[in-house]
Swiss-Prot record:
Pfam families: ACPS
MF terms (GO), sorted A to Z: holo-[acyl-carrier-protein] synthase activity; magnesium ion binding
GO biological process, one term: fatty acid biosynthetic process
UniProt gene name: acpS
NCBIfam families in the cross-refs: acpS, pantethn_trn
Protein name, UniProt field: Holo-[acyl-carrier-protein] synthase
Source taxonomy: Bacteria, Bacillati, Bacillota, Bacilli, Bacillales
Free-text function comment from the UniProt entry: Transfers the 4'-phosphopantetheine moiety from coenzyme A to a Ser of acyl-carrier-protein.
GO CC annotation: cytosol
Keyword Lipid metabolism recorded: yes
Cofactor annotation: Mg(2+)
Keyword list, A-Z: Cytoplasm, Fatty acid biosynthesis, Fatty acid metabolism, Lipid biosynthesis, Lipid metabolism, Magnesium, Metal-binding, Transferase
Gene source species: Staphylococcus epidermidis (strain ATCC 35984 / DSM 28319 / BCRC 17069 / CCUG 31568 / BM 3577 / RP62A)
EC number: 2.7.8.7
Residue numbers binding Mg(2+): D8, E58
Length: 117
């Protein structure tokens, strides 16, 4: 049974302007996600990855119905890729369906949550 659907869109330029602010990356990305980010050497690909992770966490919190804040933080949401490259989020009590896309200027994510009964 579908519990919630969330979607988020961001201009990559906004992430470009934020990425150098003190602790922005540490606040947004988990340790595993930072390790993945550091594997990318091309600046545009790094920005796409960071923007994608930002939007997927926003979309997840919207699907959960809480938004980011007291109930769930950026650090509570770890997005990783499975063996086939599909983005995944593990969260107790839910099955998640994740989609991340980007163009040169925008990143967008959609998350569908199903209650794990």
């Amino acid at each position: 049974m579908i519990y919630g659907i969330g979607i988020d869109l961001i201009e990559i330029e906004r992430i470009k302007n934020l990425q150098n602010q003190t602790k922005f990356i540490e606040r947004i990305l988990t340790i595993e996600e930072r390790d993945k980010l550091n594997q990318y050497t091309h600046e545009q690909r790094r920005l796409e990855f960071l923007a994608g992770r930002f939007t997927v966490k926003e979309a997840f919190s919207k699907a959960l119905g809480t938004g980011l804040g007291k109930s769930v933080s950026f650090q509570d949401i770890n997005c990783y890729n499975d063996a086939l490259g599909k983005p995944c989020i593990d969260y107790p009590g839910f099955y998640t369906h994740v989609s991340i896309t980007h163009t040169e200027n925008y990143a967008m994510s959609q998350v569908i949550l199903e209650k794990n009964e």
